[in-house]
């Protein structure tokens, strides 16, 4: 069973024995238990198991008890802490001093004991010591015997916990590059300093020829391969599309296409094994290959040295990013096409926060209402009336993005793996056509997934960029997938590559300059690619970015919904500027 980090709950208390401490013991510990129950009943790990909380063995009133708590948390694999109290405590004696753990403090809003006073005092201590902490203070006063968690407090506790678990899950893992720089794309010039200092992730790299070596030497699970081919024959090959993109002289024969299917299935198994290892290989005598690279994310270069010669990685990328394969429903992997590691990191953020498979897309085209009318003779309507952005790429878009899963209200959605059903799986596969690759671009052949995302799904488009002299910055745009007139779609889609998956996206507009219209969102995007996650997760992304000291340069989240460490308030009243100043002052966590 996979091991996950845990969240440590620290119940702090007034250390004065002889009446004061004794009167607060039950109340304080009950608050800690309530927080643990809130988190474990609402948040899940990647395999669907509840996020586990560890509570200190006793309340914490003096520094020796803080040390004992820290020791226990180290043993238990804690990756973040939440301190809770209903009273005054001794700030620097009871605070969490671990340099790498994200920290939050909930000070109970009650009149009998000054929990809010401790909250303010300990947050001042965190600021003074350079250990940022999130402050949580309920809007309304509660009675002393009320151990319920108000909705506003619960929202912040869960937002903190989601982001903190993402930080903890990344630490100590690897990003695996298959190959190197793809077609001069800057995002695939992997920066090891960024990964190490900001994420706690090491960089691993294998030449793409390692995939061929394992194929030729039979270093893969042959039983799984047979199972995978049977599954592919049942669910994918029947949906093979017409080879209409290739000129007759460039079309592969039926035998060559069948060989491509076999090749890309083996390729998928081998790429997964390289990422996370496979105990079956140990049984086969391949001890080194069985280990894998401990990769939480990866990227495949593909173009051009591979795709000019061998079947492309589209099938492998799409399927690994999906919440299922021939082994059934499982957690989606994170695999960036073209080894765009910057986009791979954004995909990883989205996956860790949402639990869903991620889309990898070119932010390809802004279609204004006027341009659509000119080329189609028809008008965009409904949510698309102000213009649309075409998200499309040959490779690593999860098949979950078909929108063929449905929520309880019957609406199209993308689900985390623990909510997926066999009916969802079959619907996603049925909606996906596998077209032979365009051999003008992919000379080695292969197959590209094609589908049209259902409209009406809330999604968040995001991107991490590296800027010389500044460092990493994150941008995001919350919005929706949209349905457009099928005749409009047909015309627009045929103007690009109709063998690839398409998603029509509209951002939520507001009065911020980058979001005044749909064109401005496209015009302010920082790179050619974007990662798209199901759900409006902008608030969570902003919280996560602050933990990692990555400023957010563009977003359409309302200011009153932004949750960052309390010390960010000391860097000025404008939230964007204070974020940049705070991130610059504190610097990356692991430097």
From Swiss-Prot:
UniProt superkingdom: Bacteria
Keywords, ordered alphabetically: Carbohydrate metabolism, Cytoplasm, Fucose metabolism, Isomerase, Manganese, Metal-binding
Pathway as given in its UniProt record: Carbohydrate degradation; L-fucose degradation; L-lactaldehyde and glycerone phosphate from L-fucose: step 1/3
Named cofactor requirement(s): Mn(2+)
Active site (record annotation): 338 (proton acceptor), 362 (proton acceptor)
EC nos: 5.3.1.25
An example molecular function term from Gene Ontology annotations: arabinose isomerase activity
Location of this chain's protein in the cell: Cytoplasm
InterPro entries associated with the record: Fuc/Ara_isomerase_C (IPR004216), Fuc_iso_dom3_sf (IPR038393), Fuc_isomerase_C (IPR015888), Fucose_iso_dom1_sf (IPR038391), Fucose_iso_N1 (IPR012888), Fucose_isomerase (IPR005763), Fucose_isomerase_dom2_sf (IPR038392), Fucose_isomerase_N/cen_sf (IPR009015)
GO biological process: one example: D-arabinose catabolic process
SUPFAM superfamilies membership: FucI/AraA C-terminal domain-like (SSF50443), FucI/AraA N-terminal and middle domains (SSF53743)
Reaction equations catalysed: L-fucose = L-fuculose
Annotated Mn(2+) binding sites: 338, 362, 529
Gene Ontology CC: one annotated term: cytoplasm
Family affiliation: Belongs to the L-fucose isomerase family.
Function: Converts the aldose L-fucose into the corresponding ketose L-fuculose.
Protein name, entry field: L-fucose isomerase
Organism: Phocaeicola vulgatus (strain ATCC 8482 / DSM 1447 / JCM 5826 / CCUG 4940 / NBRC 14291 / NCTC 11154) (Bacteroides vulgatus)
Gene that encodes the chain: fucI
């Amino acid at each position: 069973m996979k091991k996950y980090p845990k969240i440590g709950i620290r119940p702090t208390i007034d250390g004065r024995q002889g009446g004061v401490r004794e009167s607060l013991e039950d109340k304080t510990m009950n608050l800690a238990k309530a927080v643990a129950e809130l988190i474990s009943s609402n948040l899940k790990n990647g395999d669907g198991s509840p996020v586990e909380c560890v509570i200190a063995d006793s309340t914490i009133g003096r520094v020796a008890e803080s040390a004992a708590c820290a020791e226990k948390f180290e043993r238990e694999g804690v990756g973040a802490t939440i301190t809770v109290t209903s009273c005054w405590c001794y700030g620097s004696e009871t605070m969490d001093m671990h340099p790498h753990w994200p920290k939050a403090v909930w000070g109970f809003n009650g009149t009998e004991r000054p929990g809010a006073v401790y909250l303010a005092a300990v947050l001042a201590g965190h600021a003074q010591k350079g250990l940022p902490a999130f402050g949580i203070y309920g809007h309304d006063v509660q009675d002393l015997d009320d151990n319920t968690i108000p909705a506003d407090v619960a929202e912040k506790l869960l937002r903190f916990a989601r982001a903190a678990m993402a930080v903890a899950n990344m630490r100590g893992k690897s990003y695996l590059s298959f190959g190197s720089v793809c077609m001069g794309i800057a995002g695939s010039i992997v920066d090891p300093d960024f990964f190490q200092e900001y994420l706690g992730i090491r960089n691993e790299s294998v030449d793409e020829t390692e995939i061929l070596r394992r194929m030729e030497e039979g270093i893969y699970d042959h039983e799984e391969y047979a199972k995978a081919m049977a599954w592919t024959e049942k669910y994918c090959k029947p949906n093979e599309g017409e080879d209409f993109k290739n000129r007759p002289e460039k079309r592969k024969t039926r035998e060559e296409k069948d060989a491509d299917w076999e090749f890309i299935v083996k390729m998928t198994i081998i790429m997964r094994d390289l990422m996370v290892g496979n105990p079956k290989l140990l049984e086969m005598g391949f001890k080194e290959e069985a280990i894998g690279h401990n990769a939480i994310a990866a990227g495949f270069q593909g173009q051009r040295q591979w795709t000019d010669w061998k079947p492309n990685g589209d099938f492998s990328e799409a399927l690994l990013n999906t919440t299922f394969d021939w082994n059934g429903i499982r957690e989606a992997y994170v695999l960036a096409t073209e080894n765009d590691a910057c986009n791979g990191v954004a995909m990883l953020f989205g996956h860790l926060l949402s639990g869903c498979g991620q889309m990898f897309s070119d932010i390809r085209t802004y279609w204004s209402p006027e341009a659509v009318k000119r080329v189609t003779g028809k008008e965009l309507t409904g949510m698309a009336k102000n213009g649309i952005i075409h998200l499309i790429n040959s490779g690593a878009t999860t098949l979950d993005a078909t929108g063929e899963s449905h929520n309880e209200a019957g609406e199209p959605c993308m689900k985390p793996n623990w909510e997926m059903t066999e009916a969802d799986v079959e619907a996603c596969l049925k909606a996906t056509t596998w077209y032979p690759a365009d051999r003008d671009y992919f000379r080695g052949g292969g197959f590209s997934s094609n589908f049209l995302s259902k409209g009406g799904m809330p999604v968040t488009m995001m991107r991490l960029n590296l800027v010389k002299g500044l460092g990493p910055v994150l941008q995001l745009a919350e919005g929706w997938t949209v349905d457009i007139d099928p005749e409009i779609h047909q015309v627009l889609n045929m103007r690009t590559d109709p063998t690839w998956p398409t998603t029509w996206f509209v951002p939520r507009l507001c009065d911020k300059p980058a979001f005044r219209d749909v064109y401005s969102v496209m015009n302010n995007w920082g790179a050619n690619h974007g990662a798209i996650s199901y759900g409006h997760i902008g608030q969570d992304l902003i919280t996560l970015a602050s933990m990692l000291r990555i400023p957010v340069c563009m977003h359409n989240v309302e200011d009153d919904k932004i949750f960052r460490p309390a010390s960010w308030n000391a860097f000025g009243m404008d939230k964007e500027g204070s974020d940049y100043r705070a991130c610059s002052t504190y610097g990356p966590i692991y430097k």
